[in-house]
């Protein structure tokens, strides 16, 4: 009940502040906490800052680098506990619901309903943006997580095709390793280990197994022979990374592929933003393909608005929400970011072949039931459960634990996190 009362109050405040802004009585202000700090990401968020300023807004940037957003969430928690929440925060998936349940999110339904968001968003994505019937977040994009990126020149020089099975990937990696090329650019950070892990789960087990294991947390799936095979593949892939991988940021791993130091990287399509920002072209300088297997893992970036005082800040929330879902921003931002628009009515004519493939695959997997939320990127589970899985995954990746031992540890960790 507390959440509902706060949301209703914030909705009235945002409506009033929007009217005051329209009448020129207030200047919209927004302090925006986000973790878009790499080259391609910074270029993308600059688009939103420019649009906000062009509409009379005053933007205070609060970027927090590191940890795939973990550091940003730590900073957010400290701000909320001190009673000084930012105006808007980059949040996604169940984390939005968790903050809503704490009664600290603002209701942006007035903006959403005035702009017909329900008709513009895929049902699955709209569901992530709503909290008990109210709109509490604005989606920016749809990222595909299960991508494999490659240096086109390296593959051509070694007569290697983009792998379509994990066996083909392993064979290519061993061939590259034999001639002194790092097969897999990887950063030894827990979230990056988890990113690779979930693509292997989807690839070896299929969407139904992925759903059972990493969404439903079914104990039989978690300790199955299929999960043992997943960890066997992770152990094999550990041998394909270089000795200096520990602690490397993801964009530095992308740079290894760009610069010809490594052949492949497994990473979401924000990596494409790095290639593009460096002036590289898909199909010419780098190659993109879904990781081996069927299905699609999605990650949706979004902004949630927090309860704040002051008409200027509330007007800033209304303006920011409207701009985030605006067709111009959705097009320009996603071209820079490497993702595809959350809105279904934005033309993809100007997008590259990788984005076209992503959009086509999202449509087909949505129809056949193999469109899956990314656990590693906060779309499938609450933090305690996803953290428990990731701890086990990274412990296995950085040790000599057997796969059989690891799956039991995985099941136990999830049980203890409940």
Locate predicted features:
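C-terminal capping/gating helix-and-loop segments adjacent to ligand/active sites or protein-protein/ligand interfaces
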Residues: 139, 297, 342-346, 359-418
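Conserved N-terminal structural module of periplasmic/extracytoplasmic solute-binding proteins
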Residues: 9, 22-98, 102-104, 114-116, ...
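Hinge/lid segment of periplasmic solute-binding proteins
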Residues: 94-146, 170, 196-198
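Extracytoplasmic/periplasmic solute-binding protein
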Residues: 134-140, 146, 170-219, 262
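Glycine-centered hinge/linker elements that transmit conformational signals in sensory
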Residues: 173-176, 215-246
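Mature extracytoplasmic/periplasmic domains
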Residues: 39, 105, 110, 259, ...
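Extracytoplasmic/periplasmic substrate-recognition and gating elements
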Residues: 50, 54-55, 82, 158, ...
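Extracytoplasmic/periplasmic substrate-binding proteins
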Residues: 35, 196, 232-312
């Amino acid at each position: 009940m507390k959440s509902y009362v706060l949301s209703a109050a914030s909705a009235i405040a945002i409506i009033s502040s929007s009217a005051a802004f329209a009448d020129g009585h207030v200047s919209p202000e927004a302090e925006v906490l986000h973790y878009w700090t790499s080259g391609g990401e910074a270029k993308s968020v600059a688009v939103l800052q420019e649009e906000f300023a062009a509409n009379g807004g005053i933007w205070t940037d609060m970027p927090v680098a590191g940890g795939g957003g973990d550091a940003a969430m730590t900073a957010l928690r400290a701000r909320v506990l001190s009673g000084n929440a930012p105006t808007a925060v980059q949040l996604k998936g169940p984390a939005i619901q968790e903050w809503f349940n704490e009664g600290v999110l603002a209701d942006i339904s007035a903006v959403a309903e005035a702009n017909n968001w329900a008709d513009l968003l895929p049902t699955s994505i709209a569901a992530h943006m709503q909290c008990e019937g109210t709109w509490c977040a604005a989606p920016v994009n749809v990222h595909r997580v299960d991508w494999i990126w490659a240096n086109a020149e390296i593959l051509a020089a070694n007569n290697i095709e983009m792998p379509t099975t994990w066996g083909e990937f392993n064979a290519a990696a061993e061939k590259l390793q034999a001639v002194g090329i790092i097969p897999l650019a990887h950063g030894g950070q827990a979230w990056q280990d988890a990113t690779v892990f979930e693509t292997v789960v989807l690839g070896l087990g299929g969407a139904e197994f992925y759903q059972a294991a990493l969404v439903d947390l079914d104990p039989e799936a978690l300790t199955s022979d299929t999960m043992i095979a997943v960890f066997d593949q992770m152990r094999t892939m550990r041998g394909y990374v270089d000795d200096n991988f520990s602690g490397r940021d993801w964009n530095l791993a992308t740079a290894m592929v760009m610069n010809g130091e490594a052949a492949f990287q497994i990473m979401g399509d924000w990596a494409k933003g790095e290639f593009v920002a460096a002036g590289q072209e898909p199909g010419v300088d780098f190659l993109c393909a879904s990781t081996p297997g069927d299905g699609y893992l999605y990650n949706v970036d979004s902004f949630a608005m927090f309860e704040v005082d002051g008409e200027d800040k509330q007007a800033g929330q209304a303006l920011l929400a409207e701009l985030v879902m605006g067709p111009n921003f959705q097009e320009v931002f996603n071209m820079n970011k490497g993702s595809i628009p959350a809105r279904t009515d934005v033309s993809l004519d100007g997008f590259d072949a990788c984005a076209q493939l992503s959009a086509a695959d999202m449509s087909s997997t949505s129809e056949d039931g193999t469109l899956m939320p990314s656990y590693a990127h906060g779309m499938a589970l609450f933090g305690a459960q996803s953290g428990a899985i990731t701890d086990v995954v990274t412990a296995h990746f950085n040790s000599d634990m057997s796969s059989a031992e690891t799956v039991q540890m995985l099941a136990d960790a999830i049980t203890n996190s409940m």
